[in-house]
Regions:
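Long, low-complexity segments enriched in small/aliphatic residues
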Residues: 28-124
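Long, contiguous, secondary-structure-rich segments that constitute the structural scaffold
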Residues: 1-54, 115, 121-135, 139-230
């Protein structure tokens, strides 16, 4: 019930007791923090009361700096000066071209997290955005005859989605952006899986797409419906 939820430390304590341990005998969250501070050098002089008095503290907060440290490394690092390594710019694996003239990147919205499995269960958060959206610059939208919140299709060499356009100057000309929280229009069905040669990370943040307005009166279909029709 609201107001009666248990803190993480209480669940951890209950689990420990079920396993036969009596070591986690905290009475409240402050006791947990005190234990953390006792074994963490950077937190040694911290306490709930000092945090409340100072509206927070910057670590390290220890015997040498009991009021916290405004700048962590002002002269050097514990192991000496930082080692700066040069990097060479490598262009994206799949740039926009005549067939797919816009560059797509993916983004997150502050209303949702990850695939939305938790945040989309909240009616308050869910009402803030439509289930899927593509951010597009006014210049590109005008060139493509796309209206604000108009129904559109987005296609790459790997996938096809239907969603709605959000016209905004937040994205530059030539770039479109799509959040990845929505199962109705999962943007990562469009993205490129080309890998970085060193880290093997896929290049999910850049690919070429073709954006078109849907026929008048046609609503965007969720990907589940598109898959059934294919």
């Amino acid at each position: 019930p609201i107001g009666e939820a248990k803190g993480d430390w209480q669940w951890l304590q209950a689990l420990a007791k079920q396993m036969g341990s009596t070591q986690l005998d905290w009475q409240n969250s402050e006791a947990v923090f005190d234990e953390m501070a006792s074994v963490t050098p950077a937190y040694k002089a911290m306490s709930y009361s000092k945090l409340e008095q100072n509206y927070g503290l910057q670590w390290p907060c220890n015997d040498e700096n009991p009021e916290g440290t405004s700048i962590l490394h002002s002269q050097s690092f514990p192991i000496g000066k930082a080692k700066l390594l040069p990097v060479n710019y490598t262009d994206v694996d799949e740039a926009a071209d005549s067939e797919y003239p816009l560059q797509l990147t993916t983004n997150r919205l502050h209303f949702h997290y990850g695939c939305g499995s938790m945040t989309r269960s909240s009616p308050l958060l869910e009402r803030e955005t439509p289930p899927g959206v593509l951010f597009i610059n006014p210049v590109d939208a005008n060139n493509l005859n796309i209206a604000h919140q108009g129904a559109i299709s987005v296609e790459s060499r790997r996938g096809y989605l239907e969603t709605r356009a959000m016209i905004t100057n937040d994205v530059p000309v030539g770039l479109v952006s799509m959040p990845y929280h929505f199962k109705e229009a999962p943007s990562n069905q469009l993205t490129n899986t080309a890998q970085d040669p060193v880290t093997k990370m896929p290049e999910l943040k850049a690919c070429a797409v073709l954006v078109k307005p849907l026929p008048a009166g046609q609503e965007p279909r969720p990907v589940q419906e598109l898959q059934q029709d294919s």
